[in-house]
């Protein structure tokens, strides 16, 4: 019997296949691929471009303005959808493909599914070397796209039309598997995109990818319950895996039943809203005082869906030497970290099974959880009301800029606004269900400490790769994923704005309103803090011109040129007025805030291991190195 076939080009088959991919979670099924971002060039416009023009199916097509920017929008879409829906990205060959590589790293580090479709050189090699092709004397097979191999969870090349079938099936298995979720890259030779093949019709049947919740073994659950009951001061670290598992109700139930405090990673923050009594906020290098105090007292840490990055563990100094660990994770590899007791399973499913086993158990924290939270809220209130003065101002980041330098910034930027006051003002003024997006600089620290999410899944921080430029481009993806009237706020510094804001124009083009909160302190403030804290002088991290004058940039005018509604706000009153007016707008807005350097929040009970120079002529650097060696003695080695 001859199998029924349909004759399609490789690109047409790709688009047809994408339209038939569904994901089912807890009995609910929906299309997995909602659309595709494209930036057409000679490598994809007559192949994938033609296929999308002819019959896109349900796929929504968005025109990106920069390959990395549109890819970050696609990544943010998947993140905001809790990895249950994605966008693909199609680019031309050469530099267009290369621009995706950084974004692939972002998706990889954050375990976020996205399908990358970079065009490749000719499979036939007839016109070689084609425009934008690299020529390696050692191998003709090497192309720009080999750079994706280090940053893809799945990587493949399609040089014949029939290869597409196995490549796509494998890619979707990886993207829809919670253990391996991340970027899948399929490089398609540009001549192959247009080549036809008789594809079996069965390949295009509706295909449902089932996201089954893995339940731990009875042994794992029983032993985990024993460890918890034997502890006096256990603490739960809520990681991104808990959020992607939709484990909010189960976390609250366990925490309330057993009086176990919750602390959060960036990826886990807003899984449970901050108003929950046992939620002490972010932990680690960027954590709250309350969370870091409680984690230092833990005799057992229960990590739920966390990778234990250095920012979560304070470079492995956050825990007492005797602290034990239980790691609950779908990834067996992640459960092995810190010599933990391993519980391999879905966060939600695991907590459903574990909670009944802990009935009657209570921790020994007593009123410490509420006391630490009250102390922290008092500290947050102090940070909300920091005021600059020209005589003896003590910024949060101390002993770096003297009063003369701070006055110079105040005069040059025409502001006395502190970063912490500005950020908390935004938190207090926006609608409770607003989504906040950020990624790099000092602002993630302020957000992790000071931003109190009132509604679950509204805190959107890319801190796996902490990629500058994600903030605005990612905000577009978050907006595309949000409910119709849900506002999205991009929290971005001037450094990240300069790095990339390409999809600001795309947001205006497609009527996807985002609100850009631009904090301008005229420099790379976060790294300047790190530099000076470790003994160096301020060196090429401030934005100063050839005459050593602080640069003054009108970022509002840049956004206005694109067509955004813009505001300038260097006081709390002006900021509140701008925020209220921005709510009334139907298109993208930007609020340009000049804030003083060194007025971001400082760390609490933390340490970050960075590569301080062992040898230097500067005494301050030598002291910093000696301090590092002292802290290393307190750190776990693995």
From Swiss-Prot:
It comes from the Bacteria. It catalyses: 3D-3,5/4-trihydroxycyclohexane-1,2-dione + H2O = 5-deoxy-D-glucuronate + H(+). Residues 442-523 are annotated as: Thiamine pyrophosphate binding. Keywords: Hydrolase, Magnesium, Metal-binding, NAD, Thiamine pyrophosphate. GO terms for molecular function: 3D-(3,5/4)-trihydroxycyclohexane-1,2-dione hydrolase activity; acetolactate synthase activity; flavin adenine dinucleotide binding; magnesium ion binding; thiamine pyrophosphate binding. The keyword Ligase does not apply. Thiamine diphosphate binds at residue 67. Pathway: Polyol metabolism; myo-inositol degradation into acetyl-CoA; acetyl-CoA from myo-inositol: step 3/7. GO terms for biological process: inositol catabolic process; isoleucine biosynthetic process; L-valine biosynthetic process. The keyword Ligase does not apply. Its cofactor is Mg(2+); thiamine diphosphate. GO terms for cellular component: acetolactate synthase complex. Mg(2+) binds at residues 494, 521. InterPro entries: DHS-like_NAD/FAD-binding_dom, Myo_inos_IolD, THcHDO_hydrolase_firmi, THDP-binding, Thiamin_PyroP_enz_cen_dom, Thiamin_PyroP_enz_TPP-bd_dom, TPP_enz, TPP_enzyme_TPP-bd. It is an enzyme of class 3 (hydrolase). Its EC number is 3.7.1.22. Binds 1 Mg(2+) ion per subunit. Pfam families: TPP_enzyme_C, TPP_enzyme_M, TPP_enzyme_N. Belongs to the TPP enzyme family. Involved in the cleavage of the C1-C2 bond of 3D-(3,5/4)-trihydroxycyclohexane-1,2-dione (THcHDO) to yield 5-deoxy-glucuronate (5DG). This is 3D-(3,5/4)-trihydroxycyclohexane-1,2-dione hydrolase. It comes from Listeria innocua serovar 6a (strain ATCC BAA-680 / CLIP 11262).
